[in-house]
Regions:
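Core catalytic lobe of class I
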Residues: 1-230
Length: 230
């Protein structure tokens, strides 16, 4: 796994690993619902020990191929076990030799309904750098419209994003929708690649899924490499 990628050749890794909540990866999205597809499916319900061991191996290999000024963006969400929320902060164990710069809250506006707790409308995106100070951060490339802009008070109609990103999920009728049952939006990946890389840099996604990372990287003139679960 990743053995063909040279050491210290990747500028940025962005990924969203399997949730380990019994989603049938390999199924298809059809008519706004998940339907069974032919072929082998990844069993997204490993033991917790096996799941963490798998992620640990992937993260270890990512660090090997990451440049000294490289960065990792890791999307993961809370899980619920026995009616108790399980935050994903255990992943910090795998990044003790890196620098946590942000925990971005990805906020979206729709999802599943619940009756005995508030509906969840966010996931985490952990932003780690390999070097404490030396890393790419193209802030000007990801500025957003300032809704309260006043020419008498502000020089620009743009402002810096915060660590809360309001980006909608990919809906069933979205032009970017694929058959993958758990697809993250191009807008999310685009902001990450823009802020963390330059044209020609190599972007890695070890859990390629629907191919969103590759689509965005190509559009932004970045090189890319990705893997998918068999």
């Amino acid at each position: 796994f990743m053995s063909e990628i040279p050491d210290k050749s990747v500028s940025l890794m962005v990924t969203s690993p399997p949730y380990n909540i019994d989603i049938s990866y390999g199924n298809k999205w059809k008519n706004r619902r998940i339907v069974s597809s032919k072929g082998k499916k990844y069993a997204d319900k490993q033991s917790e020990a096996d799941y963490r061991k798998m992620l640990g191996k992937v993260i270890k290999e990512t660090k090997r191929v990451l440049k000294d000024d490289g960065q990792i963006w890791f999307n993961i969400k809370n899980r619920y076990e026995n009616c108790v929320i399980q935050p994903p902060f255990w992943i910090m164990e795998y990044f003790k030799d890196m620098y946590l710069k942000n925990i971005v809250i990805w906020n979206f506006d729709w999802g599943g309904a619940t009756q005995k707790r508030f509906c969840s409308r966010y996931e985490y995106v952990f932003f780690f750098t390999k070097n404490k100070d030396k890393y790419t951060f193209n802030l000007d490339d990801v500025k957003i419209p300032a809704l309260n802009y006043r020419p008498d008070r502000y020089k620009s109609q743009l402002k810096n994003p915060t660590d809360v990103w309001k980006i909608s999920l990919v809906s069933g009728n979205s032009p970017e929708r694929t058959e993958h049952p758990s697809q993250y939006p191009e807008e999310l990946v685009e902001r990450i690649i823009k802020v963390g890389t330059h044209e020609g840099d190599l972007v890695l996604d070890p859990f390629m899924g629907s191919g969103t990372t590759a689509v965005v990287a190509k559009r932004l003139n970045r090189r890319y490499v990705g893997y998918e679960i068999e």
